[in-house]
Amino acid sequence: MSIDEKIVEGKYVFLKDGNQYSEETFTILMDTAPNGNYMYKSEILCRVTSGEFLKINVDFETSNSFDPLNVKVFRSLGENSSTERYEVNLKDKQVYYTFSGMDGVHKFDRNVSGKFHISTPAFVTSTLMTKMKKMNAAHVTSYNVLSTQNIWTYEKQFVENDVFLELKSLGGVEIKLNDKDLHATHCQMSEDAYNNPEKSAPADFYLSKYLNIPYKAEFPGNLEVKIDKLKAFENEYKNMFKSWLLL
């Protein structure tokens, strides 16, 4: 019998003009069976203007090669709640989507060819596609991303959009977080391969060596997301990580 074992856990803080407005705690689990899957579990908390807490729980299961298999996003705010689910059949590339919200249950499915990522509110999964498909050191790398606008009520089916990642330093860069000196992979994420000014400005991501999860990211508008705590269980999984970190 396989067992899901914890390999990484941590916490992100979300900042606007240096002030924290949200936080995310996460755990990454690995199935101990041969060619076992990974599970990313995240909880996001944010106080809204009414004083209530918006709570979002994300479960993101991938294959051992980091292809998405099952994704669940549960949102709750006061009396409102909704659930999104994606189920992926990797053999025929069929994606089954279900939304349950204030206006009932909506279902549809679609064939999606090639490699793809599924966008969620969980920051820990924001660069997961770089494990599924490595960034090209010489060129901008494109990724197909599925996303929806469905939050409390059903708006429409998921859409496919390309996002582009560009490596900014082949040898990595040194950054400081919580008085710790860290080595990170610096890349920029944008909606346009040529940084067209009519598109939104790119965001700077600094990726860790722990399954490429971000140490931090800087967005236009003086927005920042960064690791507040991070523990990698390297003693048990020394072959997966190049170094050990505890923040």
Residue positions per predicted region:
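Hydrophobic alpha-helical segments, especially N-terminal targeting/anchoring helices
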Residues: 62, 175-176, 206-208
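N-terminal cleavable signal peptides for secretion/export
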Residues: 1-57, 63, 71, 78-85, ...
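Solvent-exposed helix/loop surface patches that form functional interfaces
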Residues: 2-21, 91-183
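C-terminal structured interaction module
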Residues: 183-247
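A short, polar/proline- and glycine-enriched secondary-structure boundary/capping micro-motif
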Residues: 50-53, 79-88, 106-112, 225-230
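Short, hydrophobic/aromatic-rich segments at coil-to-beta transitions
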Residues: 2-10, 35-41, 65-72, 93-95, ...
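Short, solvent-exposed aromatic-acidic interface loops
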Residues: 45-47, 73-83, 100-106, 219-225
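Short, surface-exposed linear segments at secondary-structure transitions and domain or protein termini
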Residues: 63-69, 113-126, 210-216, 233-240
